[in-house]
Amino acid sequence: MTADIILRSDCIFTATGKAPFSGYVAIGGGRILDVGHGEPPVWLNGGETETVELGDRTVSPGFVDVHCFFTGWAAEKIGVDPEDVSNHPALLGNREKIEPLFREYMAMLNARGVTAVKEMGFDDFSGFAELLDEWERADELSLRVSFMSQPVGRPMDLAFGRAMQERFRGAFVRFSGFNRMTDGSISQLEGDLKQPYSCASDMTCALAIDWDAIAAEVRAADEAGFRFSLHAQGDAAIARVLDIYETCCRDESGRLVNRHAITDLEFSDPADLERMGQLGAIAEIYPQIQSIARREEKLRMIREKIGMERGRYYWNRRKMADSGVPLSCGTDLPLLIDDIPESVYCAVGGYFPEDNEPFNRQNMLTAEELMTAWTRGGAYALMRENELGTLENGKRADIAVLSGNIFTTPAEDARGLSAVLTLVDGRMVYRKEELASAARNAFAP
């Protein structure tokens, strides 16, 4: 089979563990036909094949955001309080408003190189699953959507989960399990800590968390074969979540069968990250989180709440990677809006927005590790690694192209890069104007 499109670049990142290289990615029939070094072989070139010369632009698997909240983004867009859960059914049930908003949402994410997301939906998602079903059947989705049910108005509904799992088996929409919050923000004394807050010697958490109820819910979901994501910020919360996961179904090597995850992991105990790696629990980290904080204010908060001795373990992704924790990336959108180069600035460089002085540099990832988390790690978290997440023969042609070489650009300069081309199933869903001449007729309407 000859290729429809061949992408040529001096920076091909396959996310398979190989170093980026100069080569090509050949695409045909919505799939990756071949990936290789140097020039593409003659057999790939047919009479209709278009070759796109990309120079040193990074060619990567499409990016996966494993923690998004479309409902919150839509509520903000139309001026509704996203924290008021009672607003969500009316919002999601209003087709006249929600359909154009979701199209805008997909376009926004595609323009940032994102090709797949995991969405949080309260309870039964207020009927939004029906819209996703309709759009998938009509081939109108440019974004793969796995969604989770977060019990808010009623208890976890396993019957709903089974129905959604049976209903969504296509290429674009899947049901991914259940999600729940545990503790809250350390800045509000609501993060659950192993030792008391420095500013409140008798306080380890201002919230009354029903850990027994959370454990029962997770075990019930696990026994039914569903994944669970638990949001935890403080070191005690992370430890308690791991205690729960250790009671779940595991394989012969002791790793979780249902790929449960922990979201956020702001402040952790290194010993627990080792436990996490042994369990195979997935970390859903927020690599851009420093971008919404000012250095002086954030460090003052850490100093006042837990002290800088414990503060050494803030955002400790280095220990996660070294402990074998599967890493994936999220934004808690609309808290953050996906910007992969900015995530390199923050999670590789360790920088806050206003300066180039790293914080906890010893806890940072390499650019290759972070890009792998955004791609292969995200696909693994969605249980779709057999068809997404890497540039390999036979996989779906979900591809993102960045405006430069993200691996040779210093982390402090990474914010100058951006997505210039995004493909989903080999179809162009975004192209920046600067790429028009390079692409020629390859992506003509």
Question: What are these language model-derived features?
Answer:
Residues 45-47, 279, 323:
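Short, structured coil segments at secondary-structure junctions
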Residues 2-160, 176, 180, 185-237, ...:
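Divalent metal-binding segments
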Residues 135-138, 163-170, 255, 276-278:
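Acidic (Asp/Glu)-rich catalytic clusters
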Residues 219-228, 236-260, 265, 274, ...:
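His/Asp/Glu-enriched, well-ordered alpha-helical/loop segment
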